[in-house]
């Protein structure tokens, strides 16, 4: 039986041959069947001359290797186990030809030039460049020393119990099957110690994949570049809401600090794509006439062409926006008006005014009141160019612009009441003037006591009660005392409050 397996690799000085015995297995292993261990023979490296002499002296003095450096005799030593255990034990009756096939270049004085330039691998484990020497059965002569520095690798892998893998990659044409050892500390991929064919292949694969990905990205950019979100002119699809918006570029004006002449005119948002396209057509016909490029035939807008002749550009654009569903989403025909989902009342709000947020204007009983509140807030924040639900002449623009915040439902109601109270105040002042003209304007000395009204004029600011009313009797003599006035001469103002 062969000795038990260990995790060490055996490096011997004998040729790599196996016993041709069928009844005994020399490569019994506890590893996986797919990974077959191999013996490595004659693994040496070149060193400098100073290091060679020191290594030779140390090896000559050592008790383990003293038998190999016998200068008086050229006897070739027999097989030794440097690590205390081996995979294969060779028979002692090997021929001298086999024993001397690989050891002759190192122990024969005729080949001392090679022996002086070569030392064992275990003398220095930090040798950076690993060199291999042919271990075939042919004689190693001086003519083959020039090829010692070349590295020939065979396609084998030696696995140990650890995660390190030893890679032997390359092609070998010699009969001896020369191997070169390389150690990889990673657990996934073996290290290849060849001329870089595998690394080159991986680099080629990486470059190919990079080129493919870059080509795909370029194709995507080319495909998405210049794509329109709608088949109609002047219509775009909103990326978040999925609704369609219509815009018109007005190149008849230039804003301050703007490089390109013109401005974008918003025509409203629409639930259907064709409605947005028709809104663009109408705006284009209003701006540029019948020469404008439209989405649909101009003959289909005969009725709208008659209506737009009586309106200015701003008025017509405002009417287009009112017909859109950009704000109401079908809940109300008025802009900025929606129905409360719990109360059922109409609420108004305006967007993008308070730090790019919506401003809530309150709830109202009718749609018209909510629409008026929105109009007042729009005029306050956006001036005369604001898009309102009703005509501008319905509101006092100067009063709205000078009003203070907040602009909400209560402020809109107060403003509406203020406008309504202006006319009743003027009529009440005229009524007071008429009452003063009815009073007598004669002097008190010439005044007839009977002509003095028996009452106190009513003033709305002061309330009078019954005890404040009295009859006026002049201070005269008893002979001239007259009878009290009749009931018809006593006056009371009808605007009393009790």
Curated annotation (Swiss-Prot):
Q: GO terms for CC?
A: nucleus
Please provide an example of a Pfam family that matches this protein in its UniProt record: AP2
Q: Which UniProt keywords apply?
A: Activator, DNA-binding, Ethylene signaling pathway, Nucleus, Repeat, Transcription, Transcription regulation
Q: Name one GO molecular function term.
A: DNA binding
Q: Where is the signal peptide?
A: none
KW Transmembrane helix (keyword) present:
no
The UniProt entry, under SUPFAM superfamilies, shows: DNA-binding domain
Q: Which residues bind DNA?
A: 231-297, 333-391
Subcellular localization(s) per the UniProt record? Nucleus
Q: Where is the composition biased (Polar residues)?
A: 186-195
What tissues is it present in? Answer: Expressed in roots, seedlings, inflorescence, and siliques. Also detected at low levels in leaves.
The record, for CDD domains, names:
AP2
Q: Name one GO biological process term.
A: callus formation
Q: Where is this region: Disordered?
A: 186-220, 422-452
Where would you say this protein principally sits, based on its record? nucleus
Q: Where is the composition biased (Basic and acidic residues)?
A: 209-220
| InterPro entries listed in its UniProt record | AP2/ERF_dom (IPR001471), AP2/ERF_dom_sf (IPR036955), DNA-bd_dom_sf (IPR016177)
Q: Name the residue ranges with Low complexity bias.
A: 422-451
Q: What does this protein do?
A: Probably acts as a transcriptional activator. Binds to the GCC-box pathogenesis-related promoter element. May be involved in the regulation of gene expression by stress factors and by components of stress signal transduction pathways.
How does this polypeptide assemble, per the annotation? Answer: Interacts with HDG2, and possibly with HDG3, HDG7, ANL2, ATML1 and PDF2.
The family classification in the record reads:
Belongs to the AP2/ERF transcription factor family. AP2 subfamily.
What is the recorded name of this protein? AP2-like ethylene-responsive transcription factor AIL7
């Amino acid at each position: 039986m062969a000795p038990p397996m260990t995790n060490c690799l055996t490096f011997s000085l004998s040729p790599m041959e196996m016993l041709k015995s069928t009844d005994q297995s020399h490569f019994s292993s506890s590893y996986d069947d797919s990974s077959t261990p191999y013996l490595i023979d004659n693994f040496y490296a070149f060193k400098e001359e100073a290091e060679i002499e020191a290594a030779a002296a140390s090896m000559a003095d050592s008790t383990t290797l003293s038998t190999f450096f016998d200068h008086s005799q050229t006897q070739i030593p027999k097989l030794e186990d440097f690590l205390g255990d081996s995979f294969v034990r060779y028979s002692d009756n090997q021929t001298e030809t086999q024993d001397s096939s690989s050891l002759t270049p190192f122990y024969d004085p005729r080949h001392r030039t090679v022996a002086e330039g070569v030392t064992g691998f275990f003398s220095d484990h930090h040798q950076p460049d690993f060199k291999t020497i042919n271990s075939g059965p042919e004689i190693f002569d001086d003519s083959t020393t020039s090829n010692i520095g070349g590295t020939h690798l065979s396609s084998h892998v030696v696995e140990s119990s650890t995660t390190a893998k030893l890679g032997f990659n390359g092609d070998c044409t010699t009969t001896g099957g020369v191997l070169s050892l390389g150690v990889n500390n990673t657990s996934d991929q073996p290290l290849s110690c060849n001329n870089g064919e595998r690394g080159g292949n991986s680099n080629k694969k990486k470059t190919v994949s990079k080129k493919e990905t870059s080509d795909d990205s370029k194709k995507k950019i080319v495909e998405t570049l210049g794509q329109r979100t709608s088949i109609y002119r002047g219509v775009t699809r909103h990326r978040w809401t999925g609704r369609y918006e219509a815009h018109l570029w007005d190149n008849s004006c230039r804003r301050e600090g703007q490089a390109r002449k013109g401005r974008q005119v918003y025509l409203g948002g629409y639930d259907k794509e064709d409605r947005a396209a028709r809104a663009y057509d109408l705006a284009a016909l209003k701006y540029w006439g019948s020469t404008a490029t439209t989405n649909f035939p101009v003959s289909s807008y005969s009725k709208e062409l008659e209506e737009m002749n009586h309106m200015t550009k701003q008025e017509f654009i405002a009417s287009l926006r009112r017909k859109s569903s950009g704000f109401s989403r079908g809940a109300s025909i008025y802009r900025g008006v929606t129905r409360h989902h719990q109360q059922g009342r109409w609420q108004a709000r305006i967007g993008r005014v308070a730090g790019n947020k919506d401003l809530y204007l309150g709830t109202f009983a009718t749609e018209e009141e909510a629409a008026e509140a929105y109009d007042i807030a729009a005029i306050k924040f956006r001036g005369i160019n604001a898009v309102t639900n009703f005509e501008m002449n319905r509101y006092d623009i100067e009063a709205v612009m000078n009003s203070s915040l907040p602009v909400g439902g209560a402020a809109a109601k107060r403003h509406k009441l203020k406008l309504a109270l202006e006319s009743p105040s003027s009529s009440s002042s005229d009524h007071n003037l008429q009452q003063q003209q009815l009073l007598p304007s004669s002097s008190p000395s010439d005044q007839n006591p009977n002509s003095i009204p028996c009452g106190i004029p009513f003033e709305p600011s002061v309330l009078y009660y019954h005890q404040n009313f009295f009859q006026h009797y002049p201070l005269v003599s008893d002979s001239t005392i007259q009878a009290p006035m009749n009931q018809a001469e006593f006056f009371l103002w009808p605007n009393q409050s009790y």
